[in-house]
Amino acid sequence: MEKRKDTKTTIAKASEAQNKSWYVIDAAGKTLGRLSSEVAKILRGKHKVTYTPHVAMGDGVIVINAEKVHLTGAKKGQKIYRYYTGYISGMREVAFENMIAKKPSYIIEHAIKGMMPKTRLGKRQVKSLRILKGDYYQEFKSQKPIVLDV
């Protein structure tokens, strides 16, 4: 069998991935999982034609109205977030309703981090994520964010 010579694979270089765009996504009324998967796709750069898995070519995302995200079904009363304080018997559990009142940005961040690769590249891509309570994002005006409807 003869090898095809006209097939070419384009691989992006790190220098080509320097022009990063920023997007603003409103989480008000959105389902947590669907919102998180779209944000993770943008952070990784999978929405671009030139996507290359080993290059950090994702864009930045600003999520506003984090406290207005919702869950489907009975998860609102059943979902529990666990964390460890570092001390003996330091395992803590916080219900979704308490967490959304105390720290709404953690809920979205936890969901998105679970969808990202657990590598050095994944950790670097998560640094381009900003989650805000409320709809005021004027501190990121210099990035010229594009409002994105997900």
Curated annotation (Swiss-Prot):
Protein origin, superkingdom: Bacteria
Q: Name one GO molecular function term.
A: structural constituent of ribosome
Q: Which GO terms describe its biological process?
A: negative regulation of translation; translation
Q: What keyword terms does UniProt attach to this protein?
A: Ribonucleoprotein, Ribosomal protein
State the Pfam families in the record: Ribosomal_L13
State any GO CC term. cytosolic large ribosomal subunit
Disulfide-bonded cysteine pairs: these are none
Q: Which CDD domains match?
A: Ribosomal_L13
* UniProt xrefs under InterPro entries: Ribosomal_uL13, Ribosomal_uL13_bac-type, Ribosomal_uL13_sf
The record's annotation in HAMAP family points to: Ribosomal_uL13 (MF_01366)
What is the similarity comment for this entry?
Answer: Belongs to the universal ribosomal protein uL13 family.
Q: How does it assemble?
A: Part of the 50S ribosomal subunit.
Q: Which PANTHER family match?
A: LARGE RIBOSOMAL SUBUNIT PROTEIN UL13M, RIBOSOMAL PROTEIN L13
* The protein's role, per its UniProt record: This protein is one of the early assembly proteins of the 50S ribosomal subunit, although it is not seen to bind rRNA by itself. It is important during the early stages of 50S assembly.
What is the protein name for this chain?
Large ribosomal subunit protein uL13
Q: Which gene encodes it?
A: rplM
